Amino acid sequence: MAAESSYGFVYGVSGPVVTAEKMAGSAMYELVRVGHQELVGEIIRLEGDYATIQVYEETSGVTIGDPVLRTGKPLSVELGPGIMGSIFDGIQRPLKDIADITQSIYIPKGVSTNALSREARWDFVVSKDLRVGGHVTGGDIVGTVDENLLIKHKILLPPSACGTVTFVAPSGQYTVEDTLLELEFAGRKQKFSMLQVWPVRNPRPVTEKLAANNPLLCGQRVLDALFPCVQGGTTAIPGAFGCGKTVISQSLSKYSNSDAIIYVGCGERGNEMSEVLRDFPELTMEVNGTTTSIMKRTALVANTSNMPVAAREASIYTGITLAEYFRDMGLNVAMMADSTSRWAEALREISGRLGEMPADSGYPAYLAARLASFYERAGRVKCLGSPEREGSVTIVGAVSPPGGDFADPVTSATLGIVQVFWGLDKKLAQRKHFPSINWLISYSKYMRALEEFYEKNYPEFVHLRTKCKEILQEEEDLSEIVQLVGKASLAESDKITLEVAKIIKDDFLQQNGYTPYDRFCPFYKTVGMLKNMIGFYDLARHSVEATAQSENKITWNVIKDNMGDLIYQLSAMKFKDPVADGEAKIRKDYDDLAEAMANGFRNLED
């Protein structure tokens, strides 16, 4: 039984917000247990002897005078082997374990289980540099655990630890609580195991932040080619309902070039999380000749719309802390938050119950500051400790503004913070053009940062992208004229612009995420397709302009009649399957097509 003094008493209850008295001496954001069922809560306001607590579970049945137990520590997550492949709720309770314990599909109140299994034994290999008498500091790698084929889990010292090694465990099988290392510093000895506990609201420290310059390739042509994101960048995907936000964030977690994925479902439909749970184990990837499930590099934080509201706020912080932990191992982590609007709505509800002054649309005045403090935890960094390593956290936040209105406070606050904006368009989605990214309003501020990467690997790409954007922009301007006077009255070169823009829109920007050949498009294929499409445009413009003065003019109709087959081949470039055909064959096919086009136009001009 805890000392009497560590108890307060419930003074008032209003939904998820509980007021308690006799709480003097407790700290802001301290974790407390409310009532006889010991519900998890967090102190969010202190006034004199009274504390206001937001409770992360259903508060029905809590009465005045119920005990409130102070734990003396902030809301924290457990970090160690066993995170990958599991699914947690917003305060890192493992849903599978709860289901096994309770034999029920609902989470009962006051259930408390360990986030990481205490029974599972892991094969620990001690680091070569570690020996008794050596000196270590925070962030140093103690050893590694092969968690699965995809994740080699490095066991790190907590950032605050340092000292002289007095004991090192030999390699072997251990649980997460067994002592692996003992340090002595200033006469005090400390024991360390695989498990660390970290408060979710504090960002994990790093040595320094680096400039991000490696692209996050996500296998969607429109994103990789026109609006690239970097590893360590921040991205917002705002869009109305049914525009395909969830499909984009799921395909990012399936096919992007990240080492680990943290997927936070924050206040979205439960079906979407179960879809992820059903799809991901079936998806496989090749690692050193063995196929393994993609779920092995994914951790899910599920906080669906029917779970308590307050835990939504925590789930975003839980997710980003897990992501930072894997970043500290030197991995590139991508974190999907679907959707930050629901998180903002949770903030609004709690703020309303506290009686704070509402700002725009009833959201609290600190909405932008909270969003910024979350997005600023992304970035590419040099990790603490030795050996030297670099890691990154990329945040992709889906925003669902009511009615698809981008002037909504959450969307406008987010756009002021993030560097990449993938705006989804309801009209495109209704035309069944997916991914429904509007290429006229989206933007990416990482173009300059990525130029070096493109120059080194795909030197012609930057020019192609500029040309492609010009064609799409011109087509937008011409479409107004066409609606007034029809196509026939346009100049020949403008007709070519329109036709090529149509090819680019239908066969390059559009992508069917449910077919084997098109659900993932590697970057070489993206560049190859763009190169041929722009090549066709340049050749056609050239031959029309060169023969404009002579008797036998080449017009778009002539090109269309003579080149029907080549135009079809341009459209059919997307049907090349990168898995079945392989890179060399696809590159060769695209080069052959480019040659055929050049010959075709040469014969036409002769």
Curated annotation (Swiss-Prot):
Q: What superkingdom heads the lineage? A: Eukaryota
Under the heading InterPro entries, the entry gives: ATP-synt_VA_C (IPR055190), ATP-synth_a_Xtn (IPR031686), ATP_synth_asu-like_sf (IPR023366), ATPase_a/bsu_AS (IPR020003), ATPase_F1/V1/A1_a/bsu_N (IPR004100), ATPase_F1/V1/A1_a/bsu_N_sf (IPR036121), ATPase_F1/V1/A1_a/bsu_nucl-bd (IPR000194), ATPase_F1/V1_b/a_C (IPR024034)
Do you know which Pfam families this protein is assigned to? ATP-synt_ab, ATP-synt_ab_N, ATP-synt_ab_Xtn, ATP-synt_VA_C
Reported EC number(s) for this entry are 7.1.2.2
The GO molecular function terms of this record are: ATP binding; ATP hydrolysis activity; proton-transporting ATPase activity, rotational mechanism
Q: Keywords assigned by UniProt?
A: ATP-binding, Hydrogen ion transport, Ion transport, Nucleotide-binding, Translocase, Transport
Q: For this entry, list what GO says about its biological process.
A: ATP metabolic process; lysosomal lumen acidification; proton transmembrane transport
GO CC annotations, alphabetized: proton-transporting V-type ATPase, V1 domain
The record ties this protein, via SUPFAM superfamilies, to: C-terminal domain of alpha and beta subunits of F1 ATP synthase (SSF47917), N-terminal domain of alpha and beta subunits of F1 ATP synthase (SSF50615), P-loop containing nucleoside triphosphate hydrolases (SSF52540)
| Reaction(s) this enzyme catalyzes, per UniProt | ATP + H2O + 4 H(+)(in) = ADP + phosphate + 5 H(+)(out)
List cystine links.
none
Binding-site list for ATP: G239, A240, F241, G242, C243, G244, K245, T246
Describe, as the record does, how this protein assembles with itself and its partners: V-ATPase is a heteromultimeric enzyme made up of two complexes: the ATP-hydrolytic V1 complex and the proton translocation V0 complex. The V1 complex consists of three catalytic AB heterodimers that form a heterohexamer, three peripheral stalks each consisting of EG heterodimers, one central rotor including subunits D and F, and the regulatory subunits C and H. The proton translocation complex V0 consists of the proton transport subunit a, a ring of proteolipid subunits c9c'', rotary subunit d, subunits e and f, and the accessory subunits vah-19/Ac45 and vah-20/PRR.
The UniProt function text for this chain reads: Catalytic subunit of the V1 complex of vacuolar(H+)-ATPase (V-ATPase), a multisubunit enzyme composed of a peripheral complex (V1) that hydrolyzes ATP and a membrane integral complex (V0) that translocates protons. V-ATPase is responsible for acidifying and maintaining the pH of intracellular compartments and in some cell types, is targeted to the plasma membrane, where it is responsible for acidifying the extracellular environment. Required along with other vacuolar ATPase components for the removal of protein aggregates which form in immature oocytes in the distal gonad.
Please give the family membership noted in the entry: Belongs to the ATPase alpha/beta chains family.
PANTHER family xrefs: H(+)-TRANSPORTING TWO-SECTOR ATPASE, V-TYPE PROTON ATPASE CATALYTIC SUBUNIT A
Instruction: State the protein's name.
Output: V-type proton ATPase catalytic subunit A
The upper taxonomy is: Eukaryota, Metazoa, Ecdysozoa, Nematoda, Chromadorea
What gene is this protein a product of?
vha-13
